[in-house]
Amino acid sequence: MKQTIGLLFIFLLWGNFCRAEIRIMPLGDSITEGGYEKRPGFPTTEGSYRTSLVPRLLSLNSKLSFVGSREAGPTALAQKRHEGHSGWRVDELIAGRVYARSYERGIRSWLPTYNPDIILLMIGTNDILQNYFIDQAPLRFQKLIDEIQRLTPRATILIASAIPTNNDHLNAEIEKYNSEIHSFVLSQRSQGASIYWVDMYNEAKMSWRKGDFSDGVHPSALGYLKMADVWFNHVAPFVSASLLRASLRE
């Protein structure tokens, strides 16, 4: 009898495991959104790093679903959903953004709606570009993470450092910001939080001189390929591990 119950439990667990869908939310600004290559004759960047990352992850696990309120990418991209918002700062991801005639909500709307299992977060570039109380940007980032954890306590958060620009002064500010964010992530990890560091700035090795940018800020198609490689290396190990956790959540 006990053996029968045990086998039944395994069967039911395996059934849930097979049905589990892992929801991934790319979250950030225009670098996550993509599509800012304006030079004639250059490959499009529509879909950003997602154009290369999505099919590679789907080849590992077909039960992945990219989620978000926005949709962008080339026709060949099977899943185009994301939360990349052009010009947005850290604080705006929390509170939303007021436009001349409209208001767009932030994570307090998106996260409960899409309930992601994995969040790919890259944000902070616009805080520096807009010179928006830069010294307080790391504190705003901590508040953002606190809110994400409150709204989606089961989610795994992968945090990418901000990438360089073609301006040395801005890069110095970006490096300082990245360093403080990294320290925060390490502190969170020591407390058992499901939060991980992706050193995009150094691992992607992107440079204006190498043709990795379409302008002073946004990656070119080549730059996005490098970003996709880094994301893939960090996300792939979580895909299968998250499957079981998602099945238990159902």
Model-derived regions: residue spans:
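Sec-dependent N-terminal signal peptides
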Residues: T4-W14
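Boundary at the C-terminal end of the N-terminal hydrophobic targeting segment
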Residues: C18-A20
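Conserved beta-strand elements of the Class I
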Residues: R23-M25
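Active-site-proximal beta-strand/loop segments in catalytic clefts of secreted hydrolases
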Residues: L27-I31, V67-A72, L121-N126, A160-T165, ...
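Sec-exported extracytoplasmic/periplasmic mature domains
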Residues: T32, Y36, V54, L58-S59, ...
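Catalytic His-Asp segment of secreted/periplasmic serine-dependent ester chemistry enzymes
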Residues: R81-S86, I163-R245
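Active-site segments of SGNH/GDSL-like serine hydrolases
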Residues: M122-L129, I145-Y177, Y201-A204
